[in-house]
Amino acid sequence: MEEKKVDLKDTLNLPRTEFPMKANLPQREPQILEKWKGLYEKIQKERKGREVFVLHDGPPYANGHIHVGHALNKILKDVINKYNLLIGKNVNFIPGWDCHGLPIERAVEKELSKKKIKKESLPKTEFRELCREYAKKYVNIQREDFVRLGVLGDWEHPYLTMDPKYEAQEIRELGKFFERGLAYRSKKPVYWCIYDKTAEAEAEVEYYEKEDPSIYVKFPLKSGEKFGIKDKKVFAIIWTTTPWTLPANLGIMVKEDADYVLVEVEDEVWIVAKELMDKFFETVNRPEGLVLETVKGKDLVGLEYTHPFVEKEKLKGHLSEETLKNMWKIYPSEFVSLDTGTGLVHMAPGHGQEDYVVGQRYGLEPYAPVSDEGRFVEPAPEFLINVRVFDANHLIVGVLKEKGFLVHEEKIRHSYPHCWRCKNPVIFRATPQWFIGMDIEFFGKTLRQRALEEIEKVKWIPEYGKNRIKSMVENRPDWCISRQRFWGVPITVFYCENCGEIIKDREVFERVAQLVENSEKGSDVWFELTSSQLLPEGYKCPKCGGDSFTKEEDILDVWFDSGCSHAAVIRPLGFQKADLYLEGSDQHRGWFQASLLESVGSYLEAPYKAVLTHGFIVDEKGRKMSKSLGNVISPQEVVKEFGADILRLWVVSEDYTEDVKLGKNLLKKIADDYRKIRNTLRFIIGNLYDFNPRTNALPFEKLHHFDRWIISELQNLLKKVHENYEKFLFYRVHNHIKNFVITTLSAIYLDVLKDRLYVYAPASWERRSAQTALWHLLIALTTSTAPYLSFTAEELWEHVGKLDPSLPESVFLYEMPKPDENLKDEEVLKDYEILLKVRDEVMRALEVARKEKGIIKHPYEAKVYIRGDESVESLLKKYEDYLNFFFTVSQVELREGGEVQIEGEELPVKVGVNKAEGEKCPRCWIYYQKEEFVGCVCKRCAKALSEMGIELNAVC
């Protein structure tokens, strides 16, 4: 019976792995999530006692599904946390949610309106319960979305700003501000939303383009005698884009040291700033009049005028005697600019921050005859009563025109503050509010001074963030912390009904905090219990001894809510401050600033060591994502089509410090990069199926020089990877890894290595050396990509664990290798720097031989001739025995020759190519002379077969 022949192909060590080529991420990732259940807790247990890295999560708002902005933010945080895990630290990451505030109130009101129920008809606590349930619902929805992205954290115990413990700590924090004299109540102008009927913080205001009337108005001076003008009426000319504020005008401001001109215009005299005169007359489309006199701003101070359409008599009984005495005069102000207008600025202390400051200086109260809904009320002129402010503009312009006080009117498009929730324009309106004073001293310094000092101690990434927040803190007004709404933490102060004293004792705050903490529904107790039930038993007013008290009805600004998170979340765990806060760049005026001011006011220090910001997401054309443009991409959609790892790879592929582009074409390109990386990792693990790193790995010094080269290059890569992870430059991490995988590994190392892996006997030195290098590569690449390609790294790790069962069950319980100088061969690195350049020249020559001359079809069909200068030639001689494998050709001779000849472009070498001599070995495909064959295969293959126990006659 004829003996069955062994197929030569079956004698090759071809790759074998169960790690699939097709990722199928959308289907595979949920299986990995199952495996990760309990991983965060296991890490906490195993890493106990290690250095802890604390990234404090800025709480997203518990409303709606997550969008790609949320995904970008949480993935960036996750990459940082996982890198810190992989360098051996313990990581504390407690996700949080912002649960109070107007958007939730609005959403609940909308639901109620469907049932024809008005919010006002429900008890406050019942409405608050509906808000609580709404927030819970979206916390759960968003939590699922974040977990699906592969974000690791304590998802079972997140912090919620509506949690009773959190609210109680917030009340204690508030108490400190009262105790230190930093919190006060005052009537002053604040941003006011007339649609939501509440005050707003600076951070809650967004600027959009708005069209408004731009008008120039004549205010008649009572007399021009100071300038010797008796026979003509003298007018101060003001410019405004908010005509609706004119009913509240109490003064005109000028720049003391600026020049002003008195200009004769027909039978009148107009006063404008000299510097703005030409521009003014051009704008109002009138010929310039005769300048009668030039005076300084200080010469105008004290002059009295009459209001174009408001009668003083009607204000009596509504305004204080002091205001009535000081109103309608010209006052000096440092806020007057000579950039636009006339240099004379209409002042309404009830409708502008700067106007208010000057008004306070000169005894003018913040008068604002406007209701919560933005409608004019008494004592505004009769024609305006019950009219909305923005609707009043054209009525006021009409009256000015009719009375002859309108100089000019046009339309202007300008940037105007809008409510971040309802997107409607807001107004500045003086109402009684609670404030935290930026310039009140405590412990020898003001809150502003301390905050600015702390900013200097924090690391800001990118650096421009420092100047941004610094200028905001330098210029910000006092912090308005009160809101006229239902769903939030109450401002827990009482008023004595007998003497009006504000009760703000520490023991009172502590008593309320304890009641809140011990109630299932937290701060609802404030609305459920009476003052006497909330106050300590037998409490008396410290001023008059009274025992009847009224509760404050306002609630706290949600920025104070989230600004307390360091005190409610980080400090109770024993951490003085977080290592890092990371949010979008809009949070310099939002959470970063609120947290800074709250922490400095409470603990005299910043709550963070470093602050990192990212940009916003735009489409591939750089446009903002919007439903109207149809360019919105949801993370859920990306995960469903591509998988979360593709979204994660997108995050690290971009420079997130700028605005980040996202679109389907970009995602396809990212998916293509992913495939290249995955296939390379698959090839590596596929060639380790018979390798036991514990018993088969060789020491570095005993490795083949080509393997020593790649491991040396790997140390260089690890150095760059660690450096850029530490600097949060993830796009550089990814670029370095991607280039290494695609260029250094796929195109060079692994391509050359195939011969050694496939042809030599499985346990040969040549193959074990190659496998040792592959093992180093596998561990380094799996761990260094794990922070961002988390699902893929974990999937791969399951296969890695089969090769070495002593490894931990998850890649995130292992440590990423650090660059090791003992695994670097500088001589080999230097040699290969030249050899690779020679290889490039050889590849170029082979391409000419294949494409242009048709001499060869495959590189193994080639014989290569190389001639170089002395230094190149001596290097080539050093590695002569390996050159044909390195160039993937059959033969190499160090002399001139060949049918195809090219001159080196980068090196002084000549490369020639001829068809290889001899015959092709059917097993390794390399050409040898007849005498180099044993039977039907070359001597090298014959040796390998012998070591494998395969007799030649079984294959030949």
Curated annotation (Swiss-Prot):
Short name of any one Pfam family annotated for the protein: zf-FPG_IleRS
Cofactor(s) for this UniProt protein: Zn(2+)
Alphabetical GO biological process terms: isoleucyl-tRNA aminoacylation
Enzyme class name: ligase
Residues annotated as binding L-isoleucyl-5'-AMP: E583
Gene Ontology molecular functions: aminoacyl-tRNA deacylase activity; ATP binding; isoleucine-tRNA ligase activity; tRNA binding; zinc ion binding
Annotated motif 'KMSKS' region, positions: 624-628
Location within or outside the cell: Cytoplasm
Record: residues binding ATP: K627
Binding site for Zn(2+): C921, C924, C938, C941
Chief site of localization: cytoplasm
InterPro entries: aa-tRNA-synth_I_CS, aa-tRNA-synth_Ia, Anticodon_Ile_BEm, Ile-tRNA-ligase, Ile-tRNA-ligase_type1, Ile-tRNA_ligase, M/V/L/I-tRNA-synth_anticd-bd, Rossmann-like_a/b/a_fold
PROSITE patterns per the UniProt record, alphabetical: AA_TRNA_LIGASE_I
Alphabetized UniProt keyword annotations: Aminoacyl-tRNA synthetase, ATP-binding, Cytoplasm, Ligase, Metal-binding, Nucleotide-binding, Protein biosynthesis, Zinc
Cofactor stoichiometry and binding remark: Binds 1 zinc ion per subunit.
Function: Catalyzes the attachment of isoleucine to tRNA(Ile). As IleRS can inadvertently accommodate and process structurally similar amino acids such as valine, to avoid such errors it has two additional distinct tRNA(Ile)-dependent editing activities. One activity is designated as 'pretransfer' editing and involves the hydrolysis of activated Val-AMP. The other activity is designated 'posttransfer' editing and involves deacylation of mischarged Val-tRNA(Ile).
Annotated domain remarks: IleRS has two distinct active sites: one for aminoacylation and one for editing. The misactivated valine is translocated from the active site to the editing site, which sterically excludes the correctly activated isoleucine. The single editing site contains two valyl binding pockets, one specific for each substrate (Val-AMP or Val-tRNA(Ile)).
Family: Belongs to the class-I aminoacyl-tRNA synthetase family. IleS type 1 subfamily.
HAMAP family named in the record: Ile_tRNA_synth_type1 (MF_02002)
The protein's assembly and partners: Monomer.
Protein name stated in the entry: Isoleucine--tRNA ligase
Taxonomic lineage from the root: Bacteria, Pseudomonadati, Aquificota, Aquificia, Aquificales
The gene coding this protein: ileS
